[in-house]
């Protein structure tokens, strides 16, 4: 009872600490035991009231471990000697409780739990768990997997990678029941973090296949593990594993996870995974075609990182936030050229900054190089979402927030150049730049010789640092005042780094129509493009542009006239609608599903046009799907509008029924009652592939319209429409 109250008090304190200001609170207090009688948890025994925790927390960690380890060793000894399945289960539960309580400790939980996890391995407990995972009793396997998931710190992952991957993969092949699947997905989530080689082994041996299979389930905890596992696989697996993930359609299977309307943590983890995949240039286009990437920026813009941080702190498996290695993997997202990656990276680091500031461990952000990347986002970003997140993270870390840089660099006056020099750390050269009256035009055309001779930058390394910053500025700059043919965007479509050459080209009087006539020598001597590979790529693309005048806009795939339009009720049918989208895409159909259900204007026209252009109309009938259509005689409801449009255009309507109860026909508006003449297919979550095969038979040229429920033309297994 005391343990429960104390843990609840910890969570409540964390909530208020992260919700509001913490006056003078740079440290966290670790409470002593309850002043009343009774036995407190092992970390509180013997205390004398609140104690301050230093950032290192060495003394507190050591004291906690000295009290905890004897109890852990006793529990492990009992587990080793347990005879029957019931005794084994009791032993596993006792060890699990000790480890879980350690993870929940504020500020020092990671270090204390690390000590317990190491002790379990050194005492033979990890090897014992791997044996118990092969036990014939299902309950024993479930409990052993649950404990193993909790103790997979770095050294324990090493051990499992050496001797236990086969055991884990055999469990993954079982796929059922969901209680076991949850823990196995959690184990895979941790093992994908071990190394690039381990990721490759897991992917090759079926670990990724198991995670992707579980993405079609509905259990929130399982889906969250799947999203985190896919994110870790993408972050730690390297480009070869990322290619394999895309080949196995991981980007598509992330869609229902990112589209979930019930679990924001799940959506964010899924968005992180797909954003990481999109940073791989080899598979970027395939990831874009999945449709999942389009969900990232709107989701990030709609959420509060402070609330997300509180959710992480309140969950036992994420209460300590990410470790330094995991945080280091997020920094490249900030430096990516993709908006989605920058947004999700800034969001996660902002949330982690809130957690680490509460723990007094903000120094880790300097150690991993995140501070400069966050400052660059603030300085160079024209996107309000990622800029606001980066500013918030910097404030939480106690760092100075730089001023945004004006993008119209060619029009800069001397004062803007001075401000930029100060922000990039070159204040000592402000005077020489001022004396030479360097404005935006001169800055963009500055050569290394001029920098050394006229501006006094003698050190070669310093000049390299300066040109690295100048290249970033050139890439970021807006050239619309001097670039009439939009050469900058065309160069950026070849490679985002090529935008840096825009001003040199337009200053020579070049535009897109003349570029193919230029020689490589002219690009070098007149335009200042010193890298030969870049010159060759630009000239090759310019000559190809003669046959394709707008290469940067490229023709879109057949998404303008989709094969299937999916209509669904947002509050009850989004999960099934997103699953249908993935299944149909994997079978070669192009699918339209509206993401945000915007309320007016051009979006309404686009939505109606999408219904009219689609060959088939799939209607998801989830609980209460038609309730808002009743008495909607003005046809203001979205689902009502979509159904009426599909009926009037003679579309092949395929209703999919999932827990739907039919209303009486007369309560529906007359203009949509004809939908009752179509047979529906009952959705089965357990037999999704079989259900999809039935749906595809309807979509491939076989109309689902059938006014007689028992007609010979009705699909086997289809459910007749309307009440009976």
UniProtKB/Swiss-Prot annotation:
Q: What is the effect of changing residue 531 to D?
A: Slightly reduced ability to form an octameric ring and promote axonal degeneration following injury
Q: What result follows from mutating residue 601 to P?
A: Loss of NAD(+) hydrolase activity. Abolished ability to promote axonal degeneration following injury
According to its UniProt record, how is this protein modified after translation?
Phosphorylation at Ser-548 by JNK kinases (MAPK8, MAPK9 and /or MAPK10) enhance the NAD(+) hydrolase (NADase) activity. Phosphorylation at Ser-548 and subsequent activation takes place in response to oxidative stress conditions and inhibits mitochondrial respiration.
The effect annotated for residue 453 to A is: Does not affect phosphorylation level
Question: Outcome of residue 454 to K?
Answer: Reduced ability to form an octameric ring and promote axonal degeneration following injury
Q: Name one GO biological process term.
A: protein localization to mitochondrion
Its recorded reaction(s) are: NAD(+) + H2O = ADP-D-ribose + nicotinamide + H(+); NAD(+) = cyclic ADP-beta-D-ribose + nicotinamide + H(+); NADP(+) + H2O = ADP-D-ribose 2'-phosphate + nicotinamide + H(+)
Instruction: Name any GO cellular component annotation.
Output: glutamatergic synapse
Q: What is the effect of changing residue 150 to A?
A: In WQH to A mutant: Increased NAD(+)-binding to ARM repeats, leading to decreased NAD(+) hydrolase activity
Documented effect of changing residue 14 to A:
Loss in ability to localize to mitochondria and reduction in apoptotic activity
Q: Can you tell me which residues bind NAD(+) 1? A: 103, 110, 149-157, 190-193
- Name the UniProt key words of this record, in alphabetical order: Cell projection, Cytoplasm, Differentiation, Hydrolase, Immunity, Innate immunity, Mitochondrion, NAD, Neurogenesis, Phosphoprotein, Repeat, Synapse, Transit peptide
Swapping residue 519 to A leads to an effect described as:
Does not affect phosphorylation level
User: What is known to happen upon mutating residue 471 to A?
Assistant: Does not affect phosphorylation level
Its localization reads: Cytoplasm; Cell projection, Axon; Cell projection, Dendrite; Synapse
Q: Where is the transit peptide?
A: 1-27
What does the UniProt record report as the effect of altering residue 533 to D in this chain?
Slightly reduced ability to form an octameric ring and promote axonal degeneration following injury
What causes induction of this gene?
Up-regulated by lipopolysaccharides (LPS).
Q: How does it assemble?
A: Homooctamer; forms an octameric ring via SAM domains. Interacts with TICAM1/TRIF and thereby interferes with TICAM1/TRIF function. Interacts with MAPK10/JNK3 and SDC2 (via cytoplasmic domain).
Q: What is the protein name for this chain?
A: NAD(+) hydrolase SARM1
Identify the species of origin.
Homo sapiens (Human)
User: Upper lineage ranks?
Assistant: Eukaryota, Metazoa, Chordata, Craniata, Vertebrata
